[in-house]
C-alpha cells in the first residue's frame, strides 16, 4: 500500500495500492463501522502491521460483479462531452436511438458515438442502470444510510458516507467514481447551459440508493441528498483510521 505524505493532515492511503487481502480487510473494517460493530480482538494490531508494510500483490482488481466495458466507455464519452449539452439524462432526442443504446450496453458492444446524440446515449445509460444495476451499494449499507438521513443523525452520516466507496466491489466503485466525474462536468457548466442539476440527482438517487423492501416509502429527496453527499466522497484515498 502507498500512503500520501502530509505532516499536517491524517495519513491517507491510496486505495489502488492495496492488495486483495488489504482491500478485504478495509471493506470489513468499513462495514463494521457502518454497522456500529467493533473490530475483532487483535484486528487493530494486524491492521497497523499492514499499514507499515508495502504490498506487492497485483490482483486487487479481481471483481465480484462485472460491469460491461461498453458502460464505462459510454460514461467516459458523456463526461467529456456533456459540458455544453442541456437536459442530459432528463430528455432524449430519439426514443429509437435510446433503445438501441440500451441494447448495445447490455450486449457489451460499443455505441457509434458519431451517429447518436449525446442526450440519447445518456438516456440509454440511465435506463441501463435502472434495469440492470440493482445492487450498486450493498443492502445493509443502504438500510443504514437511509436510517441515518431519515433521522438526520449527523454522526452516523459522517461515518457511513466516506466509507461507502470502500465497501462496494471494485466495478461499482469505478462506476460511482465515473458517475461523480460526469456530475462534476455537468455542474461546472450548469449555469451557462441552464441545466437542472438537482433534477439529475433526483433521478439517480433512487437508482444508486435503491430502496430496501421495508423502506419503499423513503422520500426521493432523502435519496437525492444521500447521492449528493456520496458524490463529494473521496474514491481514491482513505484515512488510515478506516482500518480500525
Curated annotation (Swiss-Prot):
Biological process annotations from GO: signal transduction
A family per Pfam: RhoGAP
Coiled-coil residues: none
UniProt-listed Gene3D superfamilies: Rho GTPase activation protein (1.10.555.10)
Chain ranges passing through the membrane: none
Domain of life (superkingdom): Eukaryota
SUPFAM superfamilies xref list: GTPase activation domain, GAP
Protein name: Uncharacterized protein ECU09_1400
Taxonomic source organism: Encephalitozoon cuniculi (strain GB-M1) (Microsporidian parasite)
Amino acid at each position: 500500500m502507498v500512503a500520501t505524505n502530509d505532516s499536517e493532515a491524517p495519513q491517507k492511503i491510496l486505495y489502488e495500492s492495496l492488495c486483495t487481502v488489504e482491500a478485504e480487510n478495509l471493506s470489513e473494517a468499513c462495514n463494521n463501522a457502518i454497522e456500529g460493530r467493533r473490530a475483532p480482538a487483535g484486528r487493530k494490531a494486524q491492521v497497523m502491521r499492514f499499514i507499515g508494510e508495502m504490498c506487492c500483490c497485483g490482483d486487487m482488481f479481481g471483481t465480484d460483479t462485472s460491469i460491461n466495458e461498453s458502460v464505462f466507455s459510454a460514461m467516459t464519452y458523456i463526461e467529456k462531452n456533456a459540458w455544453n449539452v442541456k437536459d442530459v439524462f432528463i430528455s432524449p432526442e430519439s426514443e429509437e436511438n435510446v433503445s438501441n443504446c440500451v441494447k448495445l450496453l447490455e450486449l457489451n458492444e460499443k455505441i457509434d458515438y458519431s451517429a447518436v446524440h449525446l442526450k440519447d446515449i445518456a438516456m440509454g445509460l440511465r435506463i441501463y442502470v435502472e434495469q440492470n444495476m440493482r445492487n450498486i451499494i450493498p443492502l445493509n449499507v443502504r438500510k443504514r444510510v437511509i436510517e441515518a438521513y431519515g433521522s438526520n443523525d449527523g454522526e452516523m452520516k459522517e461515518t457511513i458516507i466516506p466509507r461507502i466507496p470502500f465497501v462496494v466491489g471494485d466495478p461499482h466503485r469505478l462506476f460511482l467514481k465515473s458517475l461523480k466525474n460526469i456530475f462534476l462536468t455537468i455542474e461546472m457548466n450548469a449555469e451557462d447551459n441552464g441545466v437542472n442539476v438537482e433534477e439529475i440527482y433526483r433521478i439517480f438517487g433512487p437508482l444508486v440508493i435503491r430502496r430496501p423492501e421495508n423502506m419503499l416509502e423513503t422520500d426521493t429527496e432523502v435519496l437525492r441528498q444521500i447521492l449528493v453527499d456520496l458524490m463529494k466522497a473521496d474514491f481514491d484515498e482513505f484515512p488510515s483510521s478506516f482500518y480500525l
